[in-house]
Amino acid sequence: MEPIPLEAEKPGSCPEPFGGSLMNRGSFLFVESNTTGTGELLMKRARLLGFETYLVTRNPARYPFLRDSVAQLIEAETRSPDELVGVATKLSGLAGIYSSSDYFVEAASSAAMAMGLPAANARAIATCRNKWKQATELQRHSIPIPETWLATSIRDVENILAHGTLPVVVKPVSGSGSSGVRLCDSAAAAIAGFNSAKSVLQDQVDLPSPDILIQQYVEGKEYSAEIIAYDGKLHCLGILAKHKGPPPCFVEVGHDFPAPLLEPSLQELASFASGAVSALGLEFGPAHVEFVITESGPVIIEVNPRLAGGMIPVMLSHALGTSILDMVIRLYAGEGFTPPRGSARAGAIRFRLAPTSGKLKSLGFSRNPDPTVPEAGLLKSEGGDVQIKGDFRDRVAYAVGVADELDAAAAAADRMIDSLVIDIETAADESDKQDPGPGEGRWALHPEAMKLLAPPIEISRDGRLLQHQAAIDEAHLVMLADQGLVSQAAAADLLKHILDLQDEGFQSLEGRDAPRGVYLAYEAELAARAGPEKAGWLHLARSRNDLNATISLLVLREAACSISQQIGIAQGALLQRVEEASSLVAPLYSQYQIALPGSPGHYLLGVFFALGRERQRLHSLLEDIRNCPMGAGAGGGTSMPIDPLKTASLLGFEEPSFNSLDAVASRDHHLHGLSIFASISTLLSRVAQDLQVWTTREFALIDVPRNLAGGSSMLPQKKNPFLLEHIKGSASTVIGAYVSAATATCKAPFSNSIEVSNYGCSPLRLSEEALQRALILTSLIVKGMSFNVRSMRDHLEDGSSMTAIAAERMASRGIPFREAHTQIGEIAQRLSQDDCATQRRSELASQLAGVFPVSLEECRDALQFGGGPGKRSTDDQLSVAKTHFREMELKCAEISERWAHAEAHCKGRVKELIDKHRSTCRSGVCG
C-alpha cells in the first residue's frame, strides 16, 4: 500500500474548534522557539487570536518552518535580556513576551519583567534551568529526588561512581528534550556520556555545558504533571503516563492522559507535583513536572519552567476540548487564566523514531485517520537527512488518539503510528551495491562459524571497546593531519563523524553483523557516513594488531584504576571502623585457636595494610603502562613518517613502544594485572571466611544487619550472611581468569595471535566484574557489621590467652623463656576443664602472681611491640595507615588527572581541526 503523506497535517497543525479571532489585539513577541512540536503552532495560534506575531532569534537557520511562518522575523542576541528589551520597545502595542524553548525562557522572562509584562520570576526560572541548583532547592524542601551529583571533569565522574551505585543517569545541567541524557551501567559508559553531554548543547543551540549532572537511576513507571501557576494558585491540567524508547536514551515515544491510576492517586500526585513547583518559587505560567513512582512513593526527576513539549499540549487540547496553547498565550498577554473543565475524554500520543541514520527517501501513513485520530503529522521531510541523536530529534512522525476510554485512545494512536511507512537510504546501502574490493570484502565467513565466533554487535557488551576505538582514531587522525599524511579536510570530516558516533552511543552499530570483528564493522559505518574515499585514510600506517594491543592496554588501565578506587573505598570503610573498634578486646586467633587478646581494630588494620600493598601493586602496574603500541602496525612498524610519540601522548601514554614486535606480541601487563586481581580476591576471600566464621553461634563475635543477610526457605530461625559466600565465590572467577589468560598465552608465538589478543585478554572483564562485586560487598559488610562486645570478652574469660604475656614477663625477670613457657604450660594443663572460665582464670592468676596481667586490657596493651594490638601500637599503626591512605589517594588522583588532561588535550585538538575546516569552508575554500 502506498503511504499517505498527509501534506496538510504539518507538524504543529491544530484544529480550529478551539476558537480564534483575527481582530487586532496588539503584538506578541516569541523569543526563539521549539524547533519541533508546538513552537510553530504557538505562533499560528497567536496570529489567529488577533496578535501581530514576531519571532526574535539569533539564528534563523534553526527554524525550517520560517519559510511559511505567520511570524515576522527579527534577528538579535536572544541570550541577552537587554537586547530583547531593545527589540520589545520597538514593537507597538506589545501585549506579551514568551518563549517555548527551555534555553531562552529565563531571558524572555527577564525582558518581560523589565517591560512590565506578565512573566514568571526570572530567578526562579534560573534555579529551575540549572538542574543542580534545582536539585539542591528541592532537597532543601525535603522533596524526594534521586541522589544527585555535579561533575565538571572525568575525575569527578570517577569519584562519583566510586561512591555511587550503577546504573546512573548522565545529563547536561541545563539541557532539554532528552538531549545528552544517557542511562549508564558502567564507568566507561558514564565517562562517554559525560563527554557527549558536554558538547550536545553546543551543537544544538551554541551554548556551552561545562557542568554535567549525574543522578542515581530510579526504577519505576514515569509520569508527568502539567501545571499552570496563576494568581497564587497552582492548577494541574492533568497527570500523564510516559512511554520511552529503548535505553540508554530517554526519548519519549508516547503519553497517555489521564494516567491509568485511581482518582485519589491522581489527586495526590497533582498535589505532590505542585509542591515541587511551589518549592522552586514558580508562581506564574506553565510548568512541566517529571517524576517516577517507586515502591516507596513518587520521586521528582525534574521540573521544567515551561509548557510541555513533544506535542503534549496538542493532545491535551483535543482531550480537554479547549486549546492549551491559546490558554498560555492569553495568560502571557495579561488576559488571565480560567482552568479547563474536567475532562470527559481520554487522549494518547505516539511517536515513531527513525530506525537509522541516512537520507529519508519516503515517509507517510498508509491509512487515513479515523474519527478517533484527530491529528497525525510528519516531523521530517522527504529528501532530508536523518541523524540518530538519541533525543527528540529522532522523532519522524506522531499520531494523537482521543476517545472516551484511555485504552481506545491509545489503540487509535497506535494503529495510526503503526501504519507509518518509512524508507531511509543509508550510505551503507550504497556501498553494499559496490563490488567488494581487494581487502576484507573478499572474505565471507561461513555462517556457522560467524554464529559461533562473531555474534552481532551489542552496545551493552561492545560499547566500552568502541569508545576506546574512537579515542584511538581521534589521536591517530590528529597525528596524521599534523604530519601532513592526511589532508586536514579529510581528517576533520572523519573526526566529525566519529564525534557523531560517540554522541549517539554507537547505536547505529547495535545488532550489526561483525564477521571480521567489531573494528571493521565500525570502520564500515564511518565509510557509510564519510564516504569510502575519506574513510580509506583512517587506517593509514596502522593495523588491527597495534590497534588491538592499544585497546587492550586502555581497557586494562581503566580496569586497574577502577579496582584501585574500590580498594580505596574499602580502606576508607576499614579506617572508619578502626577508630571505634580499637578500644574493644577480642580474641586474636592462630589456626582457629585463641592465641592472645587483641582487638577488632587491630584485625581491620591488618586487612587495611594488606589491601594497601595490593593497591600499591596496581599503582605500579599503571605506572608501567607507559608505552603505546600505536605505530607498530602488524608487528613491523611502517614506512610512513608518523609521530608515534604524539599519538601516545594524546592517549595518555608517556612514550611509544620501542620495539614493534614487542608492542603487538606482549600481554605481560594483562597477566600481571590479572595476577594482582587474583591476589586481591584471595585476600578478600580469606577475610570473608573469617567474618563468616565469626557470625556463627559458636564464635558470635560479629553480627551483620538484616539487609546484608538472608533467610532460609525451610529453617525459620536461620540468618544467613550469604553475601560473604559471594565474596568467597568471586575469588574462583578471578583466579580462574588469570589461569585462563596464562594458559592461552603460554603456547602462543611471540607475535600477534588470536590466542594472545583474544583469549589472553578477554578474561579481564569477567575478572574485573567479579572483583568489583567482591570489593563492594566487602565494603558494605565492613560498614554494616556490629561487634558483639560481650561475646568477645567471654571467649577470653578463662585467662589462657594471657599466659604468653606471663611467660614473657617471667623471661624479663631472668627465667629462660623456654623454661617459663614449660612451667606455665604445665600449670595450664592441670586446670580442671570442669571449672567455669572465671575460676580457671582466678587459678592462673593465683599461681602466676606478679606476672599474670590484671585485666584483658592490660594484657592487650602490653602487646605494643612488633605491630601488636596494644593501644600505643594501634595508635601508631592508625597514624601510618592514614598517611599511606592519603598518599595513595593523591597518587591515584594524579594518574587519573594525567589521563584526563591527555583526553581533554586530544578533544581540544579534534575540535580545533573541525573548527578550522568549517572556517575554511565558510570562506569558500573547502576541500
From Swiss-Prot:
PROSITE patterns: ATP_GRASP, CPSASE_2
Ranges where the record places region Argininosuccinate lyase: 431-927
Descriptive protein name: Argininosuccinate lyase 2
Signal peptide range in chain numbering: none
InterPro entries, A to Z: Argininosuccinate_lyase, ATP-grasp, CbamoylP_synth_lsu-like_ATP-bd, Fumarase/histidase_N, Fumarate_lyase_fam, Fumarate_lyase_N, L-Aspartase-like
SUPFAM superfamilies: Glutathione synthetase ATP-binding domain-like (SSF56059), L-aspartase-like (SSF48557)
Superkingdom of source: Bacteria
Gene3D superfamilies hit by this protein: ATP-grasp fold, B domain (3.30.470.20), Fumarase/aspartase (C-terminal domain) (1.10.40.30), Fumarase/aspartase (Central domain) (1.20.200.10), Fumarase/aspartase (N-terminal domain) (1.10.275.10)
Gene name of this polypeptide: argH2
Keyword annotations: Amino-acid biosynthesis, Arginine biosynthesis, Cytoplasm, Lyase, Plasmid
Catalytic activity: 2-(N(omega)-L-arginino)succinate = fumarate + L-arginine
Amino-acid biosynthesis among keywords: yes
GO biological process: arginine biosynthetic process via ornithine; L-arginine biosynthetic process
Main location: cytoplasm
GO cellular component: cytosol
Entry keyword 4Fe-4S: no
E.C. number(s) listed in UniProt: 4.3.2.1
Pathways per UniProt: Amino-acid biosynthesis; L-arginine biosynthesis; L-arginine from L-ornithine and carbamoyl phosphate: step 3/3
The organism of origin for this protein: Mesorhizobium japonicum (strain LMG 29417 / CECT 9101 / MAFF 303099) (Mesorhizobium loti (strain MAFF 303099))
One Gene Ontology molecular-function label: argininosuccinate lyase activity
Lineage: Bacteria, Pseudomonadati, Pseudomonadota, Alphaproteobacteria, Hyphomicrobiales
Compartments, as annotated in UniProt: Cytoplasm
Pfam families membership: ATP-grasp_4, Lyase_1
